[in-house]
C-alpha cells in the first residue's frame, strides 16, 4: 500500500545520502593521500656528505648533524666504520666503489637515492674525503637536481690535504710552491692529462689513485720535463693509525714504492715542499 511505497522511497533516499557521504569521504581521503605524496616529493632531499680521509675526528660538525638526522645512509667503500656511530638510527646500505674490485653500479646508486628521497626520508650519501674531489659528487648532484630533488653538499677534508699535514708537508709554502694541483691517475683516457702543464706548473702536485700507475706517472712527468730529483712523498692510509709514508724522488719512486710495498689507498705528493718539510724536521730534531 501507500505506506510501503513511502517507506521504500525513504530507504532509497537514505541509501543515496549514505553513498554520497561515503564518496565524499573517499574523495577527501584520496585528496589527502595525494597531498601527502606531493609534500613528500616537494620535500625530497639528499645530503652529499664528506666523511673525510679516515680519522673520524676530522668529521665536520655539519656532517655529524646530517648523519644524526638521517633515515637512510648510502655508504662508500672508503668510509671509516667508526663514522657510522653518528647514525645508529639509520638504515645503512653499502654502495662501495673501488678500482679493481667489484663495485656498485652508479646508475643503481642514483635510483636508490631518488627512491628514498621521494619517500620523504632524510637521505645521506656518505663519501670518503670530499664529495666534490674525485667523489662523483658533482655528477650525483646534477642527476638528482634534474629530477626535482634538493641536494645539499657537506664538505669533507680530502685525503691529499690530511695526508700531507700528517707528514708535516705544507702543500703551499711561500717562495717554494705557489699553488696545489689535484689530479686523479684513475682515468678512462690517460692522454687527457696535460703532463707538460703538470710538470712545469710550479705547483705542488697531489695525485690520487696512482699506486697502480706509478711507473707510468714517473715516465710521463720525466718526459714532460720534470726534474728527476723532484721530491716525492707516497702516503698510505692518510690520517689513520696505520698511515705509512715513503719519501723518494721522482726518478726512483717506482722502485722505492715496490720495496716499501705501497698499497692503496694512497696519495702521491710531488714537489719541493716535500724537501722543505724534511729540512724543517731536521732543524726541529737538531734543536730538541
What is the predicted role of each segment?
Residues 22, 33-36:
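Intrinsic-disorder-associated, low-complexity terminal segments enriched in Asp/Asn/His/Tyr and depleted
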Residues 43-48, 118-123, 179, 187-288:
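A contiguous loop/helix-start segment that scaffolds small-molecule binding in enzyme catalytic cores
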Residues 9, 15-17, 26:
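Hydrophobic alpha-helical signal/anchor motif
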Residues 38-56, 61-154, 162, 252-254, ...:
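Class I S-adenosyl-L-methionine
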Residues 91-97, 148-152, 171-178, 225-234:
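Short hydrophobic/aromatic-enriched beta-strand-loop microsegments
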Residues 81-82, 99-102, 158-162, 179-181, ...:
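Short gly/pro/ser/thr-enriched loop/turn and capping motifs at secondary-structure boundaries
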Residues 130-201, 244-247:
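Class I SAM-dependent methyltransferase SAM-binding "motif I" and its flanking Rossmann-like core
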Amino acid at each position: 500500500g501507500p505506506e510501503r511505497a513511502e517507506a521504500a522511497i525513504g530507504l532509497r533516499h537514505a541509501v543515496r545520502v549514505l553513498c554520497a557521504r561515503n564518496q565524499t569521504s573517499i574523495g577527501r581521503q584520496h585528496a589527502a593521500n595525494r597531498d601527502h605524496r606531493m609534500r613528500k616529493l616537494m620535500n625530497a632531499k639528499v645530503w652529499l656528505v664528506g666523511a673525510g680521509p679516515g680519522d673520524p675526528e676530522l668529521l665536520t660538525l655539519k656532517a655529524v648533524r646530517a648523519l644524526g638526522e638521517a633515515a637512510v645512509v648510502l655508504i662508500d667503500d672508503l668510509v671509516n666504520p667508526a663514522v657510522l656511530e653518528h647514525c645508529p638510527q639509520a638504515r645503512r646500505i653499502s654502495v662501495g666503489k673501488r678500482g679493481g674490485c667489484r663495485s656498485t653500479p652508479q646508475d643503481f646508486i642514483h635510483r636508490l637515492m631518488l627512491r628514498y628521497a621521494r619517500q620523504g626520508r632524510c637521505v645521506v650519501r656518505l663519501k670518503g674525503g670530499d664529495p666534490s674531489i674525485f667523489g662523483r659528487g658533482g655528477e650525483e648532484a646534477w642527476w638528482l637536481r634534474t629530477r626535482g630533488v634538493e641536494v645539499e653538499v657537506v664538505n669533507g677534508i680530502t685525503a691529499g690535504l690530511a695526508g700531507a699535514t700528517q707528514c708535516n708537508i705544507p702543500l703551499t709554502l711561500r717562495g717554494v710552491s705557489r699553488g696545489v694541483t689535484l689530479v686523479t691517475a684513475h682515468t678512462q683516457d690517460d692522454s687527457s692529462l696535460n703532463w707538460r702543464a703538470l710538470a712545469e706548473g710550479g705547483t705542488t702536485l697531489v695525485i690520487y689513485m696512482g699506486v697502480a700507475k706509478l711507473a707510468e706517472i714517473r715516465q710521463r712527468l720525466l718526459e714532460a720535463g720534470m726534474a728527476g730529483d723532484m721530491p716525492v712523498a707516497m702516503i698510505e692510509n692518510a690520517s689513520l693509525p696505520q698511515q705509512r709514508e715513503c719519501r723518494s724522488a721522482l726518478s726512483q719512486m717506482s722502485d722505492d714504492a715496490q720495496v716499501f710495498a705501497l698499497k692503496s689507498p694512497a696519495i702521491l705528493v710531488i714537489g719541493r715542499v716535500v724537501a722543505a718539510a724534511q729540512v724543517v724536521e731536521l732543524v726541529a730534531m737538531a734543536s730538541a
